[in-house]
Design a protein with these regions (language model features):
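Gly/Pro-biased beta-strand-loop elements
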Residues: 131-225
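SH3/SH3-like (including bacterial SH3b) beta-barrel domains
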Residues: 82-96
Length: 266
């Protein structure tokens, strides 16, 4: 009986043994197919760079077509009156030609109520000026400038499209040296200036509101660039003006015409 069981066991082994390589081969083939579907790569994928990057909000800009200002010279102050009368006290001053003022109402007595900011105190004020001093003009349509204080950058536009970006230094936040926000227009210019008060000067100045200028990084009394001040581009550092690298100040000086709108914002 035991002999018969042994013979049957050997017979079964003989029948199934040739099938073992076939089973193993199919399993190996399946593994190879899976490996081909998921190739191994040594390339590291930067998930952030793979995401679509948003376009700069500054790539296009629509500028105002006109602005209203006080029609006196760029360096002449106008008193803003507390009430619409010649003998009313002054509550502030505004310089002419380059700074936008908002007209609230025109009165019958020859005065107009305006909203603006006081050049001395840097505070927003609301008062009265002679209506005859108000003038509205069209702004230059070819170029436009935006100063972004939070970014410390100057954006130059041609036909509302961004063409240049300059790193800048605007006014410090303390001691009333900050650069005031608002709408201005480009005025007169000069090759250089020197301020004995601050012991500094600069090249290629372009006015946008009385003593507020675009100009190069400052130089000392010997007309040498002050390197520690030049190194501050990209952060607030000036007495209110907009400092630029020398080559950028020169480009603006040579290319941006009078009457070009300037928007200074956060």
């Amino acid at each position: 009986m035991n002999f018969i069981k042994s013979v049957l066991f050997v017979a079964v082994l003989i029948l199934i043994f040739p099938l073992l390589p076939l089973v193993a081969g199919e399993q190996e083939q399946d593994i190879n197919i899976i490996e081909e579907k998921v190739p191994v790569s040594n390339e590291i994928i930067d998930e952030e760079s793979a995401k679509p990057q948003p376009e700069s909000e500054e790539e296009e800009m629509v500028f105002p077509r006109s602005m209203t200002f006080l029609d006196v010279s760029e360096i002449t102050p106008v008193d803003i009156k507390e009430s619409p009368a010649d003998d009313s006290k002054s509550i502030g001053i505004v310089y002419g030609k380059l700074m936008h003022v908002d007209v609230i109402q025109n009165l019958e007595n020859g005065y107009s109520e305006i909203s603006t900011w006081d050049y001395r105190s840097m505070r927003d004020i609301r008062g009265f000026v002679p209506t005859k001093l108000l003038k509205t003009v069209e702004l230059n349509k070819k170029y436009g400038i935006v100063v972004a204080l939070s970014q410390q950058k100057v954006y130059i536009y041609e036909d509302n499209a961004l063409i240049k970006t300059f790193l800048c230094s605007s006014g410090l936040d303390d001691n009333n040296y900050f650069t005031p926000k608002g709408l201005y227009r480009i005025g007169e210019r000069g090759e250089s200036f020197f301020s004995p008060k601050y012991g500094q000067g600069a090249y290629y100045w372009v006015r946008f509101n009385n003593n507020y200028l675009f100009h190069s990084v400052p130089f000392d009394e010997n007309r040498n660039i002050i390197e520690e001040e030049a190194a501050k581009l990209g952060q607030k550092a000036s007495h209110g003006c907009i400092r630029l690298a020398i080559e950028d100040a020169l480009w603006l000086y040579n290319n941006i015409p009078q009457g070009t709108p300037v928007i200074i914002k956060d």
